[in-house]
């Protein structure tokens, strides 16, 4: 589908009909009249503005905990209406995929509905069907839902020419990017999400105001707290844009924040603002995020420690490799299993797995604790945590451990003092062949390139 109907409901939350809402609540199964009465009284409670009481005959209160749920109940009929227009009244086959194929052969155009709160998009295959749906839904909202579609903001869009605006993204239909392997090239269109730069620019302006507030404070502790708040906003924006093609958006955030920080630091430290630029890896705030990055950022020094502004580009793009499974839910066993399969690449470790440590290992650890040996009690306890962290697989080749693939626990840096050598970050689980290769055993030429890089990385850490 390359044609889209972008819908905009005029004042959706302010124009919800209370009578219809209560009827819909009854229809979905809320039959306790006391609960319905409480909801009705909440909806009609009104509000006071400048000492004047205003009655609320329509709409749901904005910002309330219950309002998003009530609006979803109200618009649930719209979702089912679009579904019934395509598939539900025509069910003949046992499996839905066969029905879809049958409807396609009979000339019925498929439709896909996406809705988040009051923002919705319907995808279809032809321009004629898109305009027909727009006209039909205008009448449906007016007569059945007692709401009005904004004709100025409800568009019919060709995704091949213009993208649809949805939840801060612009989604376009374009050809897949070509890879080095010609066998994977295809002329099929795919949906590509891009950040909505117009909306992002407004967010960046708000972020720049927060950066300027750093210059209003005189105490370094207050400045550091404001820097932490700015960092949380930057990371929040970056993580929201993660599923899209967002490198240009990240650079826009970093460029404008850095320019604003330059002006603030010039005002705070007129003679030494250049010395206040330090590499990210030297910052004491967010050390795991900044590890290994040499890009310089503006920072302040407190008790010999640097606290600086982070960069958005550190948050890498992450595309969803699997389509969303609508049967995921925390309320059923099947829904929870689907969630685990959707969110994790591999099956989680079983909760009842046997301990790695044998009774002989524990006895050896107790004997070794007072003698300064590496294999002390802390080692045998922490390697259990390291095994869980590594998800029961080799850190180099990625194979899962079993009776056929035995394992060793490797010390990343064996020259650390005894109080640091057995900490969890210094332990890594490797299969025996990879462990031997780390300790200078020959690397076979057929080994995966990614595994070779990891083995060489562990070798370098042994030499330091």
Mark where each language-model region is.
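Glycine- and acidic
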Residues: 6-7, 56-65, 117-123, 213-219, ...
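Acidic catalytic cores of enzymes that act on phosphate-bearing nucleotides/polynucleotides
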Residues: 263-368, 372-373
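A conserved non-catalytic segment of reverse transcriptases
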Residues: 40, 44, 50-53, 145-229, ...
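Short, charged surface segments at domain edges that flank catalytic/cofactor-binding sites
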Residues: 350-396, 419-421, 425, 458
